[in-house]
A protein has these predicted regions:
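Short acidic, glycine/serine/threonine-rich loops at helix termini
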Residues: 77-81, 128-131, 199, 230-232, ...
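Helix-loop-helix junctions that connect adjacent transmembrane helices in secondary transporters/permeases
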Residues: 153-237, 406-450
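Alpha-helical support elements that line or immediately flank enzyme active sites
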Residues: 39-73, 115-135, 206-276, 333-342, ...
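Beta-strand segments within the central parallel beta-sheet cores of soluble alpha/beta enzyme folds
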Residues: 69, 243-250, 277-287, 314-319, ...
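Glycine-rich and small/hydrophobic secondary-structure elements
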Residues: 83-124, 257-309, 366-391, 413-438
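Short coil/turn connectors at secondary-structure junctions
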Residues: 33-36, 60-64, 104, 111-114, ...
Length: 450
């Protein structure tokens, strides 16, 4: 094995500084004359904003600014950036609702920012936020992407029928239908892949600083891809040349995909810094993180596998609904689709057909999280393989071995979007079975039942 071979262990050099408390995270950093922000968030999943009274908050001790969505809109600000290049059923671009950094007229998920308060201290900002009176008129809400697709479900947007942001299809429907019609066996399962949250050690935080001398916004925050965010923020949120946006990131206390998105707070802090003429810092507490961080996964899947009497796989069929949330996050459209290329797993499957709906619901946005759709794919196919083995009364390991793609077949063109260029899948299976002592499992099960 060469010095830099694939799979070779790499000695970590970064740990001593972090383990001895010498890391430099956002909450370790403070600017001269820095102010603090607190965000009043929606307690409703879906509601019209009838009125907002901020009079008492504006005169509270230490307060410098109390701003609403109307202030944000009146100042000419844009939307929280998003990327998405899928299409709807008619071939038109996917539906991406405008996402203001502060709610305007209506809230569509619990935790959405409604009012921004800036004060000398965080405590003063929080006290002032409790003086704000927001009157809401609650509306029917839907949180399940499966239920949101049904006729009669609450609609988040008038111009988005059935709450379907996009529709994606891959594979050969005719060939797959024919294979299912001829198959000796079919197993099917309705899978609920639950929503999860990253819950990183370091809560999200932002420092915004506007320099009136050169008109440049500085955004200090934990990012995964600042070089990509810079242009998106300039074009979609601040409507300024890219050179007027400066992004700074320090040590990051965990991400797992969480920090690969652009959040409203990342727009609000530089914007309000320009208004008050001083740097502004916001750091979420743990409860606020659970209300405002992008979540992961949340898919409903109807999956079926067709196979012969001897266990030979013939086709797979998938109908999936992915929960995008009330808006489409920066990369949130991708995970429900990204996994499709690996939906057949490591098995020789002649044909497949997949249909996916990206759904809008009254929940917080989802984003790529730890594998960005691929673990969901593995879960789908492996559950079906287990069910097939059960129906045939066959050892699941041997059913896998029977259908596994041999290394001699590489490169292997799957019936979906990928071509596998290499892989020693049968060898991987052998190693896994040996390490898990698969042969000894029946005896261990008997012992556990005793």
């Amino acid at each position: 094995m060469g010095e830099f071979s694939i799979g070779q262990s790499v000695t970590r050099l970064e740990d001593p500084r972090l383990l001895t408390g010498k890391g430099r995270y956002l909450d370790d950093i403070n600017y001269d004359r820095q102010l603090y922000a607190v965000i009043l968030r929606s307690p409703h999943a879906h509601a019209d904003i009838v009125s907002i009274n901020t009079d008492a908050a504006k005169v509270a001790p230490g307060v410098h600014a109390v701003l609403t969505g109307q202030d944000y809109r009146d100042d000419g600000m844009g939307v929280v950036p998003c990327m998405g290049n899928y299409t709807r059923r008619d071939g038109s671009p996917m539906y991406i609702p405008d996402r203001p950094a502060l709610a305007v007229g209506r809230v569509r998920n619990i935790g959405y920012p409604v009012v921004l308060v800036v004060a000398d201290t965080e405590s003063e900002a929080r006290d002032a936020s409790e003086l704000i009176d927001v009157e809401y008129s609650p509306l029917p809400a839907v949180t399940s992407c499966y239920e949101a697709f049904k006729d009669g479900a609450p609609q988040l947007y008038d111009d988005c029928p059935n709450n379907e942001s996009y529709f994606y299809e891959a594979g050969d429907k005719a060939a797959t239908d024919a294979a299912f019609d001829k198959a000796d066996h079919v197993v099917s399962q309705h899978l609920v892949i639950n929503r999860v949250t990253a819950n990183a050690m370091e809560n999200r935080g932002v420092i915004g600083d506007f320099n009136p001398g050169d008109g440049r916004y500085t955004l200090r925050c934990g990012f995964q891809r600042p070089w990509l965010f810079r242009k998106s923020l300039a074009d979609q949120a601040f409507k300024v040349p890219e050179s007027k946006i400066r992004l700074v990131t320090d040590d990051i206390g965990g991400s797992y995909g969480l920090r690969g998105s652009i959040y409203p707070e990342m727009v609000l802090m530089p914007w309000v810094s320009k208004i008050v003429g001083r740097p502004v810092k916001w750091v979420a507490d743990r409860s606020e993180s659970h209300l405002s961080d992008d979540d992961g996964r949340d898919n409903i899947v109807d999956a079926s596998l067709a196979f012969d009497a001897d266990g030979t796989f013939q086709a797979i069929r998938i109908r999936s609904w992915g929960n995008l949330g009330a808006y489409v996050s920066y990369r949130g459209a991708a995970p429900p689709v990204v996994h499709i290329g690996t939906a057949i797993g490591v098995y020789t499957t002649p044909t497949a057909h997949v249909e996916i709906s990206g759904m809008l619901t009254n929940t917080h946005c989802t984003s790529p999280y730890r594998g960005a759709g691929r673990p969901e794919s593995s879960y789908m196919i492996e559950r079906l393989v287990e069910m097939a083995a059960d129906e045939l009364a066959m050892d699941p390991a041997e059913l896998r071995r029977k259908n596994i793609i041999p290394s001699s077949a590489m490169p292997y063109k799957t019936p979906l979007t990928y071509t596998y260029d290499c892989g020693e899948f049968e060898q991987n299976l052998d190693i896994a079975m040996e390490m898990a002592d698969w042969a000894g499992f029946p005896e261990r099960r008997k012992e556990s039942e005793a």
